């Protein structure tokens, strides 16, 4: 199905979670409050402020925050998190609703080397539970994911394979290195 013009809620209902290059988190809310807002069924802001979190929801949030290394920052406002931590918060907000497919745009953009490595580890952990499509220009990061890679050029598929195959592919070299 084409989701190009679909509403965000309809996309989520189809089991698709999207993380954009710039993390969509609420700066003035704590890490935990951002997660509360992402709970399925709490999309309306008024509902969020009036509802109490059930024990099982709280446990699930804490489990996910521990998994993404943010449990100790659960009371920290998002504006005080590093860029990498904000990326992890955005990813954790997505996985809270257990989507079948995660579309992750530029997860390594602007991260430190350590944050990049930890983000790759997180995505590798998640790939057993979700189908993940990563859009990324950092080839070292892509190499860490050790997955099938599809190279696009001018809107069309240029090549597919593992990183070893693609770095030796003449079409890829021509398109991206201009030889």
Question: Which sequence ranges carry the predicted segments?
Answer:
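A short, surface-exposed alpha-helical micro-motif characterized by mixed small hydrophobic
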Residues: 142-144
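ABC ATPase NBD Q-loop/coupling interface
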Residues: 1-14, 53, 79
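Conserved ABC nucleotide-binding domain
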Residues: 4-6, 64-82
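Catalytic Walker B motif of ABC-type/P-loop ATPase nucleotide-binding domains
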Residues: 102-106
């Amino acid at each position: 199905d084409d989701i190009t013009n679909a509403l965000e809620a309809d996309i989520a209902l189809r089991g698709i979670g999207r993380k954009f290059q710039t993390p969509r988190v609420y700066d003035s809310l704590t890490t935990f409050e951002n997660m509360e807002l992402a709970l399925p069924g709490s999309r309306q802001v008024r509902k969020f402020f009036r509802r109490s979190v059930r024990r099982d929801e709280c446990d699930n949030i804490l489990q996910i925050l521990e998994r993404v290394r943010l449990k100790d920052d659960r009371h920290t406002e998002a504006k005080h998190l590093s860029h990498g931590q904000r990326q992890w918060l955005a990813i954790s907000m997505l996985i809270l609703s257990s989507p079948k497919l995660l579309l992750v745009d530029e997860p390594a953009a602007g991260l430190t080397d350590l944050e990049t490595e930890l983000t790759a580890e997180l995505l590798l952990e998640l790939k057993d539970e979700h189908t993940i499509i990563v859009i990324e220009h950092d080839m070292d990061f892509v190499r860490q994911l050790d997955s099938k890679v599809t190279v696009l050029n001018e809107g069309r598929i240029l090549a597919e394979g593992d990183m070893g195959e693609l770095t030796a592919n003449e079409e890829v070299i021509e398109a991206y290195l201009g030889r």
